[in-house]
Design a protein with these regions (language model features):
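A detector for short metal-coordination/catalytic motifs
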Residues: 2, 12, 16, 34-40, ...
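Internal active-site segments that recognize and position negatively charged phosphoryl groups
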Residues: 1-33
C-alpha cells in the first residue's frame, strides 16, 4: 500500500521491554538509584493482565524488592508530581519500611528522554486500583 509515511511504534516483547526501560532509566532504579543490574527489573505500571502493554511509558525500572512492593500495593507514584507514595500498610504489615518512608514524597527518577516518562493515566490507574493508602 502506498501512502504517507507513518511512524509506527513497534510492540515490544518482555525482553525488549526490559531492555528499553533499562536504557531509558540509565540502568538505575527509579526509586533507590541502585545500579546493580542483576537486581533491576522493568515493572509494568498497568499490568499486561489488565490490558497493559509492553510500552516504555508503561514501565518503571525498579530494584526487585521495590518492584514487588509496587505490585503488592505498598508503593505508588503520584501521577502529577511523580513523587513516591508509601502505604501505611508497610509499617502495619511488617513493622518496618524506614528506607521507603524516608523517601516518601520525593520525586522518583525520570527517564533520560521526557517522551519516555511514565504515562499519567497508567499511574492514576495504579494509585486507584492497586495502591493501598
Amino acid at each position: 500500500m502506498v501512502g504517507r509515511p507513518q511512524v509506527r511504534v513497534p510492540r515490544l516483547g518482555q525482553r525488549s521491554f526490559a531492555a528499553v526501560v533499562q536504557e531509558a532509566y540509565g540502568q538505575r532504579c527509579a526509586v533507590t538509584g541502585a545500579r546493580i543490574l542483576p537486581t533491576l527489573q522493568a515493572a509494568h505500571i498497568l499490568p499486561v493482565a489488565e490490558q497493559g502493554q509492553h510500552r516504555i511509558d508503561n514501565g518503571l525500572l525498579l530494584r526487585a524488592d521495590v518492584h514487588i512492593m509496587f505490585d503488592q500495593a505498598y508503593l505508588g507514584v503520584h501521577p502529577h508530581s511523580r513523587s513516591l507514595q508509601v502505604s501505611g500498610r508497610l509499617r502495619e504489615d511488617f513493622g518496618n519500611g524506614a528506607e521507603f518512608y524516608s523517601r516518601a514524597g520525593t520525586v522518583i527518577a525520570q527517564p533520560n528522554r521526557p517522551g519516555d516518562a511514565p504515562n499519567r493515566t497508567f499511574l492514576e490507574w495504579h494509585l486507584d486500583a492497586v495502591f493501598q493508602h
